[in-house]
Amino acid sequence: MAREFSLEKTRNIGIMAHVDAGKTTTTERILYYTGKIHKIGETHEGASQMDWMEQEQERGITITSAATTAQWNNHRVNIIDTPGHVDFTIEVQRSLRVLDGAVTVLDSQSGVEPQTETVWRQATEYGVPRIVFANKMDKIGADFLYSVSTLHDRLQANAHPIQLPIGAEDDFRGIIDLIKMKAEIYTNDLGTDILEEDIPAEYLEQAQEYREKLVEAVAETDEDLMMKYLEGEEITNEELKAGIRKATINVEFFPVLCGSAFKNKGVQLMLDAVIDYLPSPLDIPAIKGINPDTDEEETRPASDEEPFAALAFKIMTDPFVGRLTFFRVYSGVLQSGSYVLNTSKGKRERIGRILQMHANSRQEIETVYAGDIAAAVGLKDTTTGDSLTDEKAKIILESINVPEPVIQLMVEPKSKADQDKMGVALQKLAEEDPTFRVETNVETGETVISGMGELHLDVLVDRMRREFKVEANVGAPQVSYRETFRASTQARGFFKRQSGGKGQFGDVWIEFTPNEEGKGFEFENAIVGGVVPREFIPAVEKGLVESMANGVLAGYPIVDVKAKLYDGSYHDVDSSETAFKVAASLALKEAAKTAQPAILEPMMLVTITVPEENLGDVMGHVTARRGRVDGMEAHGNSQIVRAYVPLAEMFGYATVLRSASQGRGTFMMVFDHYEDVPKSVQEEIIKKHKGEA
């Protein structure tokens, strides 16, 4: 089947926001107006189209990024609805990795909130162009210009309104288009009857002022427009739109729109802005990757004529068709029934069927083209972040960064029957979600699961119960500490066993140095002259990786360390992979004596909003919890405090804050980074590990 929409007419966008900004409702309205659904489902009634897991409908939040294809103004728009809750950050990360543009939804009463900052930072890292939709203009306390000011103050974003609201709260009845300089007035509740009128007299002066600011801001991003502007020539609407498009795609400018998705106002104009200002796959730089055969960098321009290259960004288990692999096609064409090479794993995979998804219903298609997002059935070895390519034109695309889990729980099956099922269930859930880890404690045999937060693990345990019918007892949440080395050192690992029969011999010298935070473990082979034969090098790396899983101080994984194998020796007969694995682990133990090992703990960025009179209490709470205040700002009668606090000190804080503020205080926390624990705390953790505490 020929391509239905050209690449110029394709948009791959994400909808991202803080929890409760109205993101799912906004997506829902997009589907309504693009003709994908006939009845609108309200999130607070638990009937939303995109939120298709039972847990999502119960909790009224989006957990997995559902991918949907819609059509608007002769364009295809592929939409990924991402969760706003901090515990599901990986869902946002992986959708941003495969998108070309995004719509950031704000709650107009609150403006930029903590999770908005997190997703904004991630989108900036990936260079994703964005437009901003200030939603909930019908809500009490809605303030459009305050929301715009938070984009400047909290995100340092070059954001400017291209619309202004007519009225606010109950009186919100229309939108001023600052490009056409016309007013759109809504006359019914479905947002389908819209009158275009002249701007009401009482709003004209404000509209002219903001139009002037918009023209100036756009002109600053473009030399030709700047010349016209300075010479006093009029900039036409077409030139202004082209300038906004160019600056938005270059991530130099962020257009701000307003509306109320719940009241069906402003969504169609936002869809127009998606088409007008967000990029097609042709507008963004060609994807880069490494050819695994030559180690050279290669690019894949967005074109059907190029060899096939795609990135798998999500695995889901569907109750009807089994394992679904969502992928974004960057170049080339793929037919169902054909074979591809998973270059990340070096495995050949057969594409059984190709499905295009609409929330949780699906349509089978024969062919996918460059720029498409689809799901494949039948891939056995592919996981999140893997590259799928033409077998004759290999390329490994940049993968998806997976954040380290910060919290862990012990789970134990209630019966023998549950035990067997639990292993399978946990393995399937871990395949779907790379931030969910399953480990068995070597000493106690207990199963430990770790993830990004309490809600994250709650949802997974709940899914284990519902989808896999596994009943389990769950322990109290524990912090996922990490260990690292703070000094460079060299150490020898020597293993020799010769007692009848085949002996064992492995001898290595390894230099350990601290690595940058977040870089993980890096191994370098610097052996010259074959003193350790090539076939044993992978065994040395494997031995280190395995022993780093249980650290040297308190059994926590060792992270952010570089290991350079630079010398060693072997025995013609007695050397084996096993011997070199053991030698590597002995070198690590030896290194620990002089490498200044340290325990790291997750630090959370905590944002606490309280009435003015409770500010003193909150400052006391932060100090008592080993936290440090990063900043404060007033918003109405409330104070917003931002602080870095160790996760270990935050358990039970909701209750403390509730009683201190008579239930009026709220807080949000987002994982920010790992940091050394103080010496006294480190000693406590080590004692506890040894069973002395």
UniProtKB/Swiss-Prot annotation:
Pfam families: EFG_C, EFG_III, EFG_IV, GTP_EFTU, GTP_EFTU_D2. SUPFAM superfamilies: EF-G C-terminal domain-like, P-loop containing nucleoside triphosphate hydrolases, Ribosomal protein S5 domain 2-like, Translation proteins. GO terms for molecular function: GTP binding; GTPase activity; translation elongation factor activity. GO terms for biological process: ribosome disassembly. The keyword GTP-binding applies. The keyword Calcium does not apply. Residues 8-282 form the tr-type G domain. GTP binds at residues 17-24, 81-85, 135-138. GO terms for cellular component: cytoplasm. Keywords: Cytoplasm, Elongation factor, GTP-binding, Nucleotide-binding, Protein biosynthesis. Gene3D superfamilies: 3.30.230.10, 3.30.70.240, Elongation Factor G (Translational Gtpase), domain 3, P-loop containing nucleotide triphosphate hydrolases, Translation factors. It is found in: Cytoplasm. HAMAP family: EF_G_EF_2_B. Catalyzes the GTP-dependent ribosomal translocation step during translation elongation. During this step, the ribosome changes from the pre-translocational (PRE) to the post-translocational (POST) state as the newly formed A-site-bound peptidyl-tRNA and P-site-bound deacylated tRNA move to the P and E sites, respectively. Catalyzes the coordinated movement of the two tRNA molecules, the mRNA and conformational changes in the ribosome. Belongs to the TRAFAC class translation factor GTPase superfamily. Classic translation factor GTPase family. EF-G/EF-2 subfamily. This is Elongation factor G. It comes from Streptococcus gordonii (strain Challis / ATCC 35105 / BCRC 15272 / CH1 / DL1 / V288). The gene is fusA.
